[in-house]
Amino acid sequence: MTSPFFLGDSTEYVRWRGRKLGGKPRGINDLLVEVGDPFSLRPLERSALLDRCRRFNMVIYRSSAVDPDTSIPRAMGAQLGLHRLDANWLADEDGISPIAVATPSEGRADFIPYTSRAINWHTDGYYHPESRCIRGMVLHCVRAAAEGGDTALMDHELAYIAVRDSSIDWIRALMAPDAMTIPARMGAD
């Protein structure tokens, strides 16, 4: 079987597209998994989390644990197979990036995710070579935003379908190895 992402095989793409569109989530409850202890997932919780990731390329977990301990997202990720943390230059010493309003002295205040300003879209990992490509992430919400704080998540495979159905040339251009590479901002300059 060839990949639905191989542009030379429209038959496999049409089959995969039908399965993907037929199995997309109908609402947020399809994505939601209740987790008792995020440090020690029960087998059924882990299985449900991985199932949502496999089917929808995302999962939303809810837990009664309110501890802001940054080892929670690290522990959750490890239990789901995420073992290499990409500690970007704005991350804390533990490699975790707290998405919260930052003070100017923290060095993050110039970047929209660390301000109270609205952000229309964001993606991670496009500054890296293939060997450091980000293939998964954990966004762990500790507290609600004081104001706003809406988050919209998108399955990248559904985005692929929408773009490919509009123009295979757009997909061809976006699949070029250098399509999403821009110089990383490495400091204050």
Residue ranges and their predicted role:
Residues 2-40, 54, 94-189:
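Active-site environment of non-heme Fe oxygenases that use a 2-His-1-carboxylate facial triad
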Residues 53-60:
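TRNA-binding/sensing appendages of the translation machinery
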Residues 77-86:
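A short alpha->loop->secondary-structure connector
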Residues 70, 86-101:
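A surface-exposed partner-binding patch
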